[in-house]
C-alpha cells in the first residue's frame, strides 16, 4: 500500500520560488499509519559528489531523505535518480516531485513502485496544523574526544564514539523530573506501552506555569521556584521538549540506582598522542505527537549521532583546509529560517569568526544548497534560535512580535504588508529609564535595532539613551549639554545612529502633513515587501514605529500597523493589544496640520 502524501505549505512556497532548472533531494517525516510528510529539499550540484547526506545531518532526527525533486526540463535529475533511490531508507517507495519553474501549476507527485512511477494526489499541511501535530526535542549532552590532529584520526575516533553512544548505556531525562527513558522505554510507571509523545508533553508545564507534576522530584525542588518547563522557541509556534543525557550503571530496566551524567565518556587510543577535545552537543529531533513513546530512545540516539557527524565534518574540513594541524572546539547552533518551517543545525568552530573566509564560504554554500538568496543572513551565529524558558536567570527582554494575534484591520479588499521577521517592543519606562515625555524616538530606535539583532545582521547590544546621546555629540550633531539630558530626537538622528551603531543606511521620506500620509501607502507597502524593517515616523509631533500597512489599491483606503513607544505599563500582551498600543490605525490617527519624516532602514547585503 502506497504512503499517504502530505506536503508542508512552507515547502510548497519554497518550490514555487525556485526559478532555475535544477534537481534536488526531498526530505520528509514518515509517521502514523503510513503517512509521508514532505518538509524540505536541497539543490544538488550538477558536478561532483551529491551533498544530500551532509544536508540530512543538519536536519533534526526523523527528517530523512525520501526522494527527488526536478525543476523545469532539468536533466541532472536522471543522473542523480538511481543513487538517491538507493539511499532512501524510510520508505520502499521513494517519491519524485516534478515542478515547473516559478509556479506550482502542474506540480506532479509520483511514487516509485517496482521501478515505475505512479502519480498520486497530495494534501497541503498548513503551518497551524504542523504546530499542532508535531513537536521537537532538544537534547544537550557532553563528551570528550581524544584524537590526533589529523582528518583520518578524527574520522576513526568519531566512528568509535558514535558506536559507544548507540550501545544502549545512555539514559535520557526530562530536566528537573523523574522521567527517565532508557533503551527499554520510559521508566516512569505513569507511562505504558501505548503512551505517546503527547502524554509526555502533557506532564511538562508550559513556560510561565508554576505547577509541579506527579513526576517532579519535590525534594529537589523544595525551596526553589524553578519547575520544569517546555522550551518556547523564539519566532515559531512549535513546542520543544528539553532532554538531558545520563549514563546507566546497568542495562537492567528495573535498576533502582539513578543514572549518572554522561559527560565522562571518552574514546582513547594509546598508540598515538591524543588531544582531548570537549564536545558539547545540542541535538534536535522532530516527532509527531502521536508517536509511541517507546520509539523516543532510538530517535534521541540518532539525533546525537547526527550532531557528532556535524562536529566531525567541521573538524575535518578545518584540518584539511587550514593545514594547521590544530584542533578547534566545535559548538552546535540551531537555526529556524522562517521560510522552512523546521530547524536546521550547524557546527561552528570556536575561534573562527563569522567573517573569516572559510565561514563565509560555508554559509554561501548552504545558501545555494537551500536555494536561499545571498543577500540576507540565515546561518550567522546571531541567527541562532533562542529558546525561552531555558534558564530562570535569563536577562530581561521586551515582548516579542506584539502584533501577532491582532484582529484584521477592516480595510475592504486590502492587502497586508508587514514587518518581515522578529522584533522586540521597546517603550517608555523600561529598564528603569524615566523617559516619559521625551524618549519615544529612542525607543523606536531600540525596536529597530532589535530587528537587526534578531535577524542576525549584528551582535551589537541595543543602544541606551545615554549611548545615543554620546554618539550624536561625538559626531558633532549635538552639543555637550545634550548628553545626559531629556531632549528628544527625530528621524534624521535615528538614521545617523543606525549608521553609526549598525552600519545600516536609511531612506528618509518627508510628508508635508498627516493628511498626505495615504499618498505614501504604496511606498510603505513596497518597503515592507523588499526591506521588511520597522519604520520610525516622527516630525512635528510624537514618534511612533510603523510595522505594517493594510492597503487597497483600488480604493486607496489604508490603515497603519502602529507600535506605540508611549506605553508606560507592564509588558502584558493582552493589555497592549486591547488598549491599542499595538494596533491598526486609520488616517485620523495622524495630525493633519503637522509634517512627518519617516526613517526607513535598508537591509545591508550580508550572508
From Swiss-Prot:
It comes from the Eukaryota. It holds the Pfam family Peptidase_C78. InterPro entries: Papain-like_cys_pep_sf, UfSP1/2_DUB_cat, UfSP2-like_N. Keywords: Hydrolase, Protease, Thiol protease, Ubl conjugation pathway. Transmembrane segments: none annotated. GO terms for biological process: proteolysis. One of its GO terms (cellular component) is nucleus. The keyword Hydrolase applies. One of its GO terms (molecular function) is deUFMylase activity. Its EC number is 3.4.22.-. The active site is at 440, 564, 566. Belongs to the peptidase C78 family. Thiol protease which recognizes and hydrolyzes the peptide bond at the C-terminal Gly of UFM1, a ubiquitin-like modifier protein bound to a number of target proteins. Does not hydrolyze SUMO1 or ISG15 ubiquitin-like proteins. This is Probable Ufm1-specific protease 2. It comes from Drosophila melanogaster. The lineage of its organism: Eukaryota, Metazoa, Ecdysozoa, Arthropoda, Hexapoda. The gene is Ufsp2.
Amino acid at each position: 500500500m502506497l504512503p499517504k502524501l502530505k506536503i508542508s505549505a512552507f515547502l510548497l512556497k519554497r518550490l514555487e520560488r525556485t526559478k532555475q532548472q535544477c534537481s534536488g533531494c526531498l526530505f520528509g517525516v514518515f509517521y502514523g499509519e503510513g503517512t509521508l510528510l514532505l518538509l524540505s529539499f536541497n539543490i544538488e550540484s550538477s558536478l561532483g559528489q551529491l551533498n544530500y547526506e551532509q544536508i540530512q545531518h543538519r536536519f533534526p532526527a526523523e527528517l530523512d531523505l525520501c526522494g527527488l525533486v526536478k525543476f523545469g526540463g532539468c536533466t541532472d535529475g536522471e543522473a542523480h535518480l538511481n543513487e538517491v533511490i538507493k539511499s532512501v531508507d524510510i520508505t520502499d517507495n521513494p517519491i519524485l516531485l516534478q515542478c515547473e519553474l516559478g509556479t506550482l501549476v502542474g506540480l506532479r507527485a509520483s511514487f516509485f513502485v517496482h521501478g515505475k512511477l505512479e502519480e498520486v494526489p497530495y494534501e497541503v499541511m498548513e503551518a497551524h496544523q504542523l504546530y499542532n501535530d508535531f513537536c521537537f526535542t532538544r537534547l544537550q549532552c557532553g563528551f570528550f574526544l581524544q584524537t590526533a590532529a589529523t582528518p583520518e584520526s578524527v574520522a576513526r575516533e568519531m566512528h568509535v564514539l558514535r558506536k559507544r553512544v548507540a550501545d544502549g548505556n545512555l539514559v535520557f531525562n526530562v530536566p528537573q523530573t523523574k522521567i527517565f527513558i532508557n533503551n527499554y522505554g520510559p521508566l516512569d510507571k505513569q507511562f505504558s506501552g501505548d503512551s505517546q509523545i503527547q502524554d509526555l508533553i502533557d506532564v511538562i508545564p508550559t513556560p510561565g506555569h508554576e505547577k509541579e507534576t506527579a513526576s517532579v522530584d519535590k525534594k529537589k525542588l523544595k525551596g526553589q521556584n524553578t519547575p520544569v518547563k517546555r522550551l518556547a522557541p523564539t519566532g515559531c509556534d512549535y513546542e520543544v521538549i528539553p532532554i538531558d543525557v545520563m549514563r546507566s550503571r546497568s542495562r537492567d530496566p528495573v535498576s533502582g540506582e539513578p543514572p549518572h551524567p554522561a559527560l565522562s565518556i571518552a574514546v582513547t587510543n594509546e598508540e598515538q598522542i591524543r588531544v582531548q577535545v570537549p564536545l558539547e552537543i545540542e541535538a534536535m529531533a522532530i516527532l509527531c505527537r502521536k508517536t509511541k513513546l517507546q520509539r523516543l530512545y532510538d530517535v534521541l540516539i540518532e539525533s546525537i549521532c547526527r550532531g557528532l557527524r556535524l562536529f566531525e565534518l567541521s573538524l575535518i574540513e578545518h584540518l584539511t583546509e587550514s593545514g594547521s594541524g590544530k584542533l578547534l572546539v566545535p559548538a552546535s547552533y540551531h537555526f529556524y529560517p522562517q521560510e522552512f518551517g523546521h530547524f536546521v543545525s550547524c557546527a561552528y568552530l570556536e575561534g573562527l569568526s563569522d567573517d573569516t573566509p572559510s565561514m563565509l564560504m560555508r554559509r554561501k554554500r548552504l545558501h545555494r544548497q537551500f536555494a536561499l538568496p545571498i543577500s540576507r543572513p540565515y546561518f550567522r551565529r546571531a541567527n541562532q534560535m533562542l529558546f525561552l524558558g531555558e534558564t530562570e536567570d535569563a536577562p530581561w527582554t521586551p515582548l516579542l512580535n506584539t502584533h501577532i494575534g491582532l484582529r484584521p484591520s477592516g480595510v475592504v479588499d486590502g492587502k497586508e504588508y508587514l514587518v518581515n521577521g522578529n522584533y522586540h517592543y521597546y517603550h517608555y519606562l523600561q529598564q528603569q529609564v524615566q523617559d516619559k515625555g521625551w524618549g519615544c524616538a529612542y525607543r523606536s530606535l531600540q525596536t529597530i535595532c532589535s530587528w537587526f539583532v534578531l535577524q542576525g545582521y549584528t551582535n551589537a547590544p541595543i543602544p541606551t539613551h545615554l549611548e545615543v546621546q554620546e554618539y550624536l555629540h561625538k559626531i558633532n550633531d549635538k552639543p555637550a549639554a545634550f548628553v545626559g539630558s531629556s531632549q528628544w530626537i527625530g528621524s534624521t538622528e535615528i538614521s545617523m545612529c543606525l549608521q553609526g551603531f549598525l552600519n545600516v543606511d536609511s531612506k528618509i521620506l518627508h510628508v508635508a502633513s498627516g493628511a498626505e500620509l495615504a499618498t505614501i501607502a504604496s511606498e510603505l507597502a513596497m518597503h515592507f515587501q523588499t526591506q521588511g524593517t520597522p519604520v520610525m515616523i516622527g516630525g512635528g509631533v510624537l514618534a511612533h514605529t510603523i510595522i505594517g500597512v493594510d492597503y487597497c489599491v483600488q480604493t486607496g483606503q489604508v490603515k497603519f500597523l502602529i507600535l506605540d513607544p508611549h506605553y508606560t505599563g507592564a509588558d502584558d500582551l493582552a493589555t497592549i493589544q486591547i488598549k491599542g498600543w499595538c494596533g491598526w490605525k486609520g488616517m485620523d490617527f495622524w495630525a493633519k496640520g503637522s509634517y512627518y519624516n519617516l526613517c526607513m532602514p535598508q537591509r545591508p547585503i550580508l550572508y
